């Protein structure tokens, strides 16, 4: 897979590819990347890439010309082009899986109040929001997408590990609690079942804890889990 990122601040993006697991993935050739500075394509003598919005309003808007020129430079029409935006589709694990099947991604990092709509009309295949909150940097949102996608590629993470994720797409539950040595710390002990050696009992315990955590922290996922199993809500709200 090749990932191309268009950004006003490439120095935020580049270190991500040069450290930890991602560096190994790049070195193995599983992923290649290119970080494009939008400013390099600005025709303004001061390399400005934003301007005031038509119709008035607060803030500045990213101009169409530098971004379209950058997109044409990377031949974005032949690739899946994403704009990270609070107005986009809510990002999910399923969408991460879908994106991991693409050969090439182009990600436009937003800034300021937004992006000239004509860029979206001409080039963007997907607008994606990473959550119901506001970020000052589209680069942060882009890294969320990249991180969630690359780990799904063949050869990055052991398939058995992917089956026991913090969020399991397959079963729709949050992950169970984890413990390691020491057995006791400040009077808190590891649950005995985890030391029992009875794998079926351990599996049952983990499922129960996953359901409990999902009900407490993500009641929406808990309801989907019940629906998937053909069960109904037990009548308790998420505070119970």
From Swiss-Prot:
Gene Ontology molecular-function annotations: tRNA (guanine(37)-N1)-methyltransferase activity
Signal peptide: none
Record field: catalytic activity: guanosine(37) in tRNA + S-adenosyl-L-methionine = N(1)-methylguanosine(37) in tRNA + S-adenosyl-L-homocysteine + H(+)
Coiled-coil features, chain-numbered ranges: none
GO biological process assignments: tRNA N1-guanine methylation
Subcellular location: Cytoplasm
Binding annotation for S-adenosyl-L-methionine: 110, 130-135
UniProt keywords, alphabetically: Cytoplasm, Methyltransferase, S-adenosyl-L-methionine, Transferase, tRNA processing
Pfam families linked to this entry: tRNA_m1G_MT
Assigned GO CC terms: cytosol
EC number: 2.1.1.228
Function per UniProt: Specifically methylates guanosine-37 in various tRNAs.
Subunit: Homodimer.
UniProt record similarity statement: Belongs to the RNA methyltransferase TrmD family.
Name by which UniProt lists this protein: tRNA (guanine-N(1)-)-methyltransferase
Gene giving rise to this polypeptide: trmD
């Amino acid at each position: 897979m090749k990932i191309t990122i268009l950004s006003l601040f490439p120095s935020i993006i580049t270190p991500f590819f040069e450290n930890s697991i991602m560096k190994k993935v790049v070195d193995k050739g599983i992923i290649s990347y290119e970080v494009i500075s939008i400013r390099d394509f600005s025709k303004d003598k001061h390399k400005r890439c934003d301007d005031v919005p038509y119709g008035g309003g607060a803030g500045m808007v990213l101009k169409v010309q530098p971004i379209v020129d950058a997109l044409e430079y990377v031949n974005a029409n032949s690739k899946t082009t994403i704009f990270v935006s609070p107005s986009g589709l809510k990002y999910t694990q399923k969408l991460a899986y879908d994106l991991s099947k693409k050969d090439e991604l182009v990600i436009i990092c937003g800034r300021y109040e937004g992006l000239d709509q004509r860029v979206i009309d001409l080039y963007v295949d997907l607008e994606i929001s990473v959550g119901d909150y506001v970020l000052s940097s589209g680069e942060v949102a882009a890294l969320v997408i990249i991180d969630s996608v690359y780990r799904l590629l063949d050869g990055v993470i052991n398939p058995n590990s992917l089956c026991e994720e913090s969020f399991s797409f397959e079963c729709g539950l949050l992950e169970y609690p984890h413990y390691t040595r020491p057995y006791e710390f400040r009077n808190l002990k590891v649950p005995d079942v985890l030391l029992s050696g009875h794998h079926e009992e351990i599996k049952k315990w983990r499922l129960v804890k996953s359901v409990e955590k999902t009900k407490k922290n993500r009641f929406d996922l808990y309801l989907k889990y019940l629906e998937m199993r053909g069960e109904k809500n037990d009548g308790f709200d998420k505070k119970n």
